[in-house]
From Swiss-Prot:
Residues 180-211 have a biased composition (Basic residues). Residues 190-212 are annotated as: 3 X 8 AA repeats of S-P-R-R-R-R-S-Q. One of its GO terms (molecular function) is RNA binding. This is External core antigen. Its main location: secreted.
């Protein structure tokens, strides 16, 4: 995707598409573009997670294909997360083709290794982060992922003697965190079930007959 925009810019074709390509490549001119801002997150929060936290790219691609193949290949717009996953998959496919082309045209094995490692450590990491983030938002919910990133960021920046030994875990986060709304009120997750009150046991003694009034006997 980015290679397409680069070719249009370098070719200097006088058409509106070039202007759009320059906007898409705004990061080349030092623009602060954070693709996670519209989802309530940021690169900074994701960078708190260690590099080995994100699964392998092949595993992420297989997961996205197994869960959302119909939505990703269809024409309809499902959600911004599906669109972001599409873009990440297309970007990684183009980078894979670029690496294959360089591997076949560069004779020096040392240079090939340096280029492949650089792509995996930079763009490969960004694609892994993007796929993990959007797949997690679709699986656990965007708000839950935001809470996890904030909790992990606070945990990792807290000195070891003053923090819990285990880091927050995304899959168990909703069970252990208390989300507070404005005004200090706690957000209720699910209504509590009221335990049924025990029924009163009827007395086994026979009922007393009402005494008849004297007027009734007359």
């Amino acid at each position: 995707m980015y290679l397409f925009h680069l070719c249009l810019v370098f070719a200097c074709v006088p058409c509106p598409t070039v202007q759009a390509s320059k906007l898409c490549l705004g990061w080349l001119w030092g623009m602060d573009i954070d693709p996670y801002k519209e989802f309530g997150s940021s690169y900074q929060l994701l960078n708190f997670l260690p590099l080995d936290f994100f699964p392998d790219l092949n595993a992420l691609v297989d997961t996205a294909t197994a869960l959302y193949e119909e939505e990703l290949t269809g024409r309809e717009h499902c959600s911004p997360h599906h669109t972001a996953i599409r873009q990440a998959l297309v970007c990684w496919d183009e980078l894979t083709k670029l690496i294959a082309w360089m591997s076949s045209n560069i004779t020096s094995e040392q240079v090939r290794t340096i280029i492949v490692n650089h792509v995996n450590d930079t763009w490969g990491l960004k694609v892994r982060q993007s796929l993990w983030f959007h797949l997690s938002c679709l699986t656990f919910g965007q708000h839950t992922v935001q809470e996890f990133l904030v909790s992990f960021g606070v945990w990792i920046r807290t000195p070891a003697p003053y923090r819990p030994p285990n880091a927050p875990i995304l899959s168990t986060l909703p069970e252990h965190t208390v989300i507070r709304r404005r005004g200090g009120a706690r957000a209720s997750r699910s209504p509590r079930r009221r335990t049924p009150s025990p029924r009163r046991r009827r007395s086994q003694s026979p009922r007393r007959r009402r005494s008849q009034s004297p007027s009734a006997n007359c």
